[in-house]
Structures are given as C-alpha cells and as structure tokens.
Design a protein with these regions (language model features):
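PEST-like, low-complexity acidic/proline-rich intrinsically disordered segments
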Residues: 1-14, 38-43
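Aromatic (phenylalanine/tyrosine) cluster motif
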Residues: 4, 8, 15-21, 26-29
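Terminal leader/tail segments of proteins
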Residues: 26-205, 209-252
Length: 252
C-alpha cells in the first residue's frame, strides 16, 4: 500500500473541504426561488457541482442534459467566466424525434435541432454560476446586446421588446456577480399562457436574493437562443454536451 505522508493527506483534506464547501454552497443556492434539488448525484464543472436532477414549477424532474463554460482568450491565456448547466424535462425527446438515431456530431452542427429545443413546450432551466467576477451591469449589457441583435435580425425588435430589455438592464445594474454567484434562467408555460415566460433569479453569498419576470415572448425566445442557439450559442462546450447527451437519449 503506497504511503504518501502528511503532505498528501493535508492536500487531500484541503481539497475535500474546498469541494464540499462549494457543493454545500451550491445546494443552498439551488433551493432558492422555485427550483429544488432532487437526489444527491452531481456533475462537477470546473469544481462547481450541478445536481443531476432538479424540480421546477411542477413535480416533474428536470435532468441535467448539458453543461459547459463560457470563456475568453487573452494573449493565449484562457480566462473562464461562468459554468453552465442546462436542465430539461425528459419529455424534450418527444419533440426531437426527427433526429432520432443521428450521431452527436451531426446534432451539434444542426442549428435546426437546437431551434427545436428552444421552441419545445417543456420546462427549461439554464443555471449560470460565476467563475470570474463581473459587474451585473456588464453582464446585463452583454445579454441585452445579444438579444437585441437576434431580435433585429429576425425583424422582431419593436417598442415592447425594447421596453422589456430596458427592464432587464435595470435588474442587472442592481446586482454584483462575484465568484460563485448564481443566476437561474427559468423558462416555463404558466397555465393558459400561449407563450413561455422566463424568471431570472439571482443568489449570492451574503446578499439578498433578487428576481424578475420576463413576459415578452420574443425576448424570452432570444434569451434561450443565447445559451441554446447551436452555432450562435454563447458556449460551444455546452452545445456539444447537449448534443452528446441528447443523442444518447434519442438512441433509446
């Protein structure tokens, strides 16, 4: 039996404590708002634990079907910005039967496939955990710009969309996204609603939770496309993960 000595044991203990702190912190965040964890299995993304299943507005479980990061490269140095987890109802596969049996690589390169994910009438949660701290106002401007450009490209940018985006920018101006802060983008169909709504929930250690509702259907759609939009998605690692996991689900 190999002997590593006290140095190894101390390092291992430190890692276990550090990881357990993040795990407990994450679970504390995820029970805020309408979202609750389900079970104890997790997927670790950049030392951040994402539960394999959560429960949203209904008793239906949502499964972690995609995960990844956003990052930038400066002078050949990778800077990781956020970790992402995408939760979908298992019923999503019923709306993707056209792609049944297709390999993951084909799905990853097919924007129509991701458009079908975006438009499928199932509950979705996109969970974003901050790695590199950033002002909320900076994040809000990035989101607003990406959504506005997509709306304009589809000729859907009118006064109602502009007003909704202004409210989103105001919401993010009121928060600070320090490391381990959490944003939930929760998409669902309220009873009798014709279009989905989104709720943005913010949690951060030592700060009061904040949330806002997004009711403009066009803006809701483009927020989803920012994260789930195939080749135009903000995180290609997440897109690849979604393609791999959904290819497995569609092969069953």
């Amino acid at each position: 039996m190999p002997i590593y000595g006290d140095g190894y044991r101390n390092l291992n203990s430190h890692f276990h404590f550090h990881f357990q702190f993040r795990l407990n912190n994450f679970f504390r965040f995820i029970v805020h708002g309408q979202i609750k964890i389900m079970g104890s299995e997790v997927e670790v993304v950049e030392e951040i634990a994402f539960p394999k299943q959560i429960v949203g507005t209904t008793t239906k479980p949502l499964s972690l079907l995609g995960h990844g990061i956003t990052d930038i490269e400066i002078h050949f140095l990778q800077i990781k910005l956020t970790a992402i987890g995408v939760y979908l109802e298992p019923a999503i596969v019923e709306h993707l039967q056209q792609w049944k049996g297709k390999p993951a690589k084909d799905l990853e390169e097919d924007d129509d496939f991701f458009d079908a994910i975006v438009s499928a009438p199932v509950e979705k949660v996109i969970r974003v955990v901050v790695i590199k701290e950033i002002k909320g106002s900076q994040y809000g401007v990035q989101l607003e710009s990406a959504v506005r450009d997509r709306l304009a490209a589809d000729d859907k940018y009118e006064e109602e969309e502009e007003a909704q985006l202004e409210k989103i920018v105001e919401f993010f101006q009121s928060i600070y996204l320090k490391t381990h802060s959490v944003l939930n983008f929760h998409f669902h169909f309220p009873p009798a609603a014709r279009t989905p709504v989104a709720q943005i929930e913010f949690s951060s250690e030592g700060k009061e939770d904040a949330k806002m509702k997004v009711e403009n259907g066009n803006v809701v759609e483009m927020i989803k496309k920012w994260y789930l939009g195939g080749s135009r998605g903000v995180s290609q690692a997440t897109i690849s993960s979604l393609a791999n996991n959904l290819a497995i689900e569609l092969s069953k």
